[in-house]
Amino acid sequence: VYKPGALKAFKLGGHSSAFGASTSVGAGLTYAADNGFATSVTVNSKGGSGNAGILTAEDESKINTQVAYTADQYHLSVTYSKQQNGWDAWSYYATTDAASDSSIDSADAYAFRAWWRPQETGSTLPSVSLGYDVISFDGHDLARNASGYMVGLNWQDTFQPDDRIGLAGGSALAIDTHVLGASDLEEMDPFLWEAYYSFRPNDSIEVTPAIFGGSNVEADKEDDLFGGVITTTFKF
């Protein structure tokens, strides 16, 4: 439900262990029951354009399996992701140490997502989106596992129809457990946030001024940041 205002990190309930925004060869199957339950399986491959082939022992690939329940005002889902031969889409939003060895043998990831929204827009209550990810590595030089999270709030139709206020915060994938011999490495807690207001001057234009920032973003040094951006979308 949360719609990001500036940062890719807050897409998909957190751009993290199981999901990615890059493109690759893939296929998927979805079954949705009338009672709100749904399940899906997707397969992605990066070897289709090379010599590795698709879904071979050498293919850089990922298989996601998701179970979800959606009602009018809330949603719950869990996704299991099996990744092999250096699948590294997760490393885009990870700390320096966690992403330092993206050519891992394999990884098992779990992504938990939930959202709730009020019955009507224009309420003082925001919609709430939560995401938590954990990933375990086989063959990583530094990490046994890592985790990250996000929380996103949206208020709609607050000052005028079709406007949106957004506020989100979260952490990139950061190492929880180091491999033997790398335990002396200490990561600082990373944190990233954004705030924005989106409105429509008319039916064809949407304007979104946003500010964003973070502390210890890469977790290996005090690398804080702060910035702002104005996005204007035209539809004809």
Residue ranges of predicted features:
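Residues that define the transmembrane beta-barrel architecture of outer-membrane proteins
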Residues: 21-25, 59-63, 106-110, 143-149, ...
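Transmembrane beta-strands of outer-membrane beta-barrel pores
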Residues: 43-47, 71-73, 80-86, 132-138, ...
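Predominantly the C-terminal beta-signal and adjacent terminal strand-loop region
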Residues: 191-236
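Long, well-ordered mid-to-C-terminal structural blocks that present hydrophobic/aromatic surfaces
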Residues: 70-157
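Repeated loop/turn-to-beta-strand initiation elements of outer-membrane beta-barrel proteins
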Residues: 35-41, 63, 69-78, 84-89, ...
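Outer-membrane beta-barrel domain signature
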Residues: 13-19, 50-56, 89-90, 98-103, ...
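Residues on the lipid-exposed face of transmembrane beta-strands in outer-membrane beta-barrel proteins
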Residues: 27-31, 65-69, 78, 112-116, ...
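Surface-exposed coil loops of outer-membrane beta-barrel proteins
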Residues: 1-63, 94-98, 177-179
